[in-house]
Amino acid sequence: MISKFIEKRMLNMLDEWYSAMSKRKMNHVCTLKEKIDQHLPKIKKNTKLWMRYQLFQARHQLLFENQNGLDSLFDGLYGLEDKMDDELKYYLYFFSGLYEMVKTAPKHAVHHFKKAEQYLAAIHNTFEAADLYYQTAGAYYLMKSPPLSVQYVKKALHIYLHQFGYIKKVITCKLLLAVNYIDQERYEKAEQLFKEIIKKTQQLHDENLLCHAYYNLGFLKATEKKDQEALLYFRKVLKNQEFEMNSPVSYLHCVYESVRALFKTGNITEAKAVLQKGKELSEKVDIQTIYLKLKTLEALYTSAEDPYEQLLEYVLELEKIEAWVDLEVLLEDITEYYKKKDDFEKAAFFIMRG
């Protein structure tokens, strides 16, 4: 047991830690965690504080895209669910949804976000609702549902725009809005918004957020089949070691798109080097989807003979893990490959799997 005074003090420290995470104050987040970890013996003596700490530890890892030990951490937390009040249950489901997003399983993420929304009334913080709406919007974007994604991101943006101190959240919402414009083929509007975001982010000196903006602008150019322009932005991200370390999953998405653009523009040596780095990193951080996508590109662009058997194996693996959005573009690339070989039977086979 610990005294009420110490319990209140520890609770305030934990909430300050979570608030810093919500505002993406990365350095402050790490400083607060170090400070809190010094009090772990006290925190472990109080069940509610210990559950809260473990939940926020999961959020901390997700912020830095670190999946190490998260499966066992969440298993343990679900075993304590009957001891949680509605506030802690909200965090449990919300963070579970975020974990599914890191694993690129948006359908499962939405399931958890909807359960979290049932407990939203227990959270006396408007910004928590905004964060939930934003993350739900992100899941719908990955599910190729722009209308629902835009609806949710605008709800989040409305909350953030009316409060001081959430400029980075406003920017992340606008980034998500812009990538939805890409899906809606509103390319000029997307580019204009990306460039506004880059200018603002440069003023904030937030390298992590800036890398996200550069990547997305590169993705727009790749979508427009302007691969040389796309590479100008992708290379800015690839050379940022801090982004690679702190946001490895996002970095890997850029690696994949870079490899694709490099092969298409004939930069074979660079493509192979980036691809090898991507395979090693995706195995290290255990991102199966990106690993399979990179192996597919490798088979498609470097095989001396017909890579049909390899391609089929990777496509079936991606289907098994329901990576439908990822498959969509890959299948187009594979189909185009066989069309150029005048093998229309195989081209038709792969396009029908889309």
UniProtKB/Swiss-Prot annotation:
SMART domains tied to this protein: TPR (SM00028)
Keywords: Cytoplasm, Repeat, TPR repeat
Major site of localization recorded for this protein: cytoplasm
GO cellular component, one term: cytoplasm
Cytoplasm keyword on record: yes
InterPro entries (alphabetical): TPR-like_helical_dom_sf, TPR_rpt
Name of the protein described by the UniProt record: Regulatory protein RapD
Gene symbol of the encoding locus: rapD
